[in-house]
Amino acid sequence: MNKEKLEIIHSWVSANVEEPCEISPASNDASFRSYWRLSFDNDTKILMHAPPKLEPLESFLDINIRLESIGINVPKILKTDKSKGFILMSDLGDKKYLDVLNDDTVYCLYTDAIDTICKMQKEASTENLKTFDIKEQRSELGIFRKWFLNEHLKINDETINKTKFNQGLEVLQNKIDSIPKSFVHRDFHSRNLMMTQKNNPGVLDHQDAVVGPITYDIVSLLKDCYITWDEKLTLDMLHSFSNKIKDVYNFSSEEFVEWYDITGLQRHLKAIGIFSRLNHRDNKTSYLSDIPRTFAYVEKVLEKYPYLTNIKSACHELEIKNLL
């Protein structure tokens, strides 16, 4: 953390927080936002700083209100300073799902998380939310092409265009666009869920919420880029989720698994692109270690559905696995 950044944080706290407190980093984030824990004698609070020109606060505040109004455990907003990019909020603790998940806790923790997804889908307002449409999918998959294929693997566009990669993505995008849509958190995974004593889980990083595929948040949870589970366990949890929402949507079990798989494929390609961008643009090298795990999810799905053959063949022709 550079000295100038620290001075900005300390200056804001001095001017806006009356009680004396200790300031320490609360978490690392895959964005321009930073989080700080303010420790008081008998309490802690979280201070989020998001440079206004890079990470406007309006979306975070908007989605926070939507989720809080239906009983989702999101931080309580205590003070905002939009002009300088600060939000002071309640502290949901330091027990990320990623740190406490194991074979003994996974069913309980994921059941709570699944109930939260169901509640968001059924009750959260989607008024004026952006739709996760083909244009948005295409933009995200462009991150994979630019930052992973071009920048990280040094594969130029001419080489990519000799394959049927683009044609394969068009098929994928159209398939995903036909999936029923609902409120989507969009980053519902083990680093953004906090284990809490009451109303578990605490839900963070919700500012990018959209109206999107009903399988988006569940695949973010069960095919997590940061932790892998046995396929039987994830399918059991998936069926538990589908049983809880089947009264709202019309689908067969096979169809739902397919929606889950292809939504995950799009998300995982995007995530690989973002991990590469974090390394090359933002000097956050630790995310590179998550690429092999994420690409393994991609490979499994490409083997399952014949209409994904063009993407599968392109990955083989570009020798992606050998270059990881």
Q: Which positions does each model-derived feature cover?
A:
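Histidine/acidic-rich helix-loop-helix segments that form or flank divalent-metal centers
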Residues: 250-258
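ATP-binding pocket architecture of kinase catalytic cores
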Residues: 36-139, 143, 153, 177-178
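An alpha-helical support segment within catalytic cores of ATP-dependent transferases
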Residues: 5, 9, 13-15, 125-130, ...
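ATP/Mg2+ or Mg2+-diphosphate-binding catalytic cores
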Residues: 273-324
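Conserved NTP-binding catalytic cores of kinases and kinase-like/nucleotidyltransferase enzymes
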Residues: 1-86, 196-201, 315-324
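Active-site acidic catalytic loop and adjacent metal/ATP-binding pocket
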Residues: 25, 34-39, 47, 120, ...
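Active-site activation/catalytic loop segments of kinase-like enzymes and analogous catalytic loops
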Residues: 143-152, 214-250, 262-282, 294-301
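Secondary-structure capping and boundary motifs in well-ordered enzyme cores
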Residues: 109, 185, 210-211, 260-265
